[in-house]
Amino acid sequence: MRFAKGHGTENDFVILPDPDGELDLDAATVAALCDRRAGLGADGVLRVVRTKALDEPLTGEAATAQRCEWFMDYRNADGSVAEMCGNGVRVFARYLQEAGLVGAAAFEVGTRAGARHVVLEPDGNITVDMGPVRILGPGSARLADGPVHGTRISVGNPHLACRVARPVAEVDLSAPPLLRAEEFPQGANVEVFREVASGVLEMRVYERGAAETRSCGTGIVAAAAAATPPGEDARWTVRVPGGECTVVLESGAARLSGPAVIVAEGDVRLSALR
């Protein structure tokens, strides 16, 4: 089976070209591909499929994806299906560009959170219209070294963004955060962030279905939204272990800009992974 490998600020993905929707991608296969010792290793899988070939209904927020030629079928490293991935969309867009599947510098990508407008910038970065950012109220979690409190946010997927007073490098993210089921019935990504200079945040994240990752695009947006006073627009640089991205918040929506690179292509023997 053909694959490519790419990353956005070191949030890395196995990319599976499947334009006609012929691949039977089950959770066990995804988990095996993402295994860093016995597989290819990644934080998730991006299946590249034409929207018209998708074998699932697109309703609710996802309905706008029906107008897109290409759909990003994103899976977490444990094989679970996810709605949206900000770094993943940028890597997906870079793959479409380098594979010759798009010709314009601006286009839309379908996701389970809806259509996302993408711009391939002249400086090499990729900007994604992340859509509306919804502030849902306060929330809390228990980390390995104690409780944290923050803001529940939806960026097409659920987040708990927690401002901390200490350097984020000191926070223990070695274990899955304990969340309240009534606040997060489907789980959530948990971010810890701190403002280190005017307009600059540092952040780490524990991703639902993946553990701590080097970056999370939707988490970067969630942290920026949590750091912004209600009703205000803002521009933030967000530093994560894998690099940095820029978030622009305007009128309740967000744009995310950052790098995305394809580092390898090849064939994987699925029979060797099972």
Curated annotation (Swiss-Prot):
The protein's Enzyme Commission number: 5.1.1.7
Binding site for substrate: N11, N76, G86, N87, N157, N189, E207, R208, G217, T218
Main localization (coarse): cytoplasm
Keyword Isomerase: yes
The keyword Cytoplasm belongs to this UniProt entry's keyword annotation: yes
GO biological process: lysine biosynthetic process via diaminopimelate
GO annotations of cellular component type: cytosol
Compartments it resides in: Cytoplasm
Pfam families, per the entry: DAP_epimerase (PF01678)
Family, as annotated: Belongs to the diaminopimelate epimerase family.
HAMAP family: DAP_epimerase (MF_00197)
Subunit structure of this chain's protein: Homodimer.
Entry protein name: Diaminopimelate epimerase
Lineage, uppermost ranks: Bacteria, Bacillati, Actinomycetota, Actinomycetes, Streptosporangiales
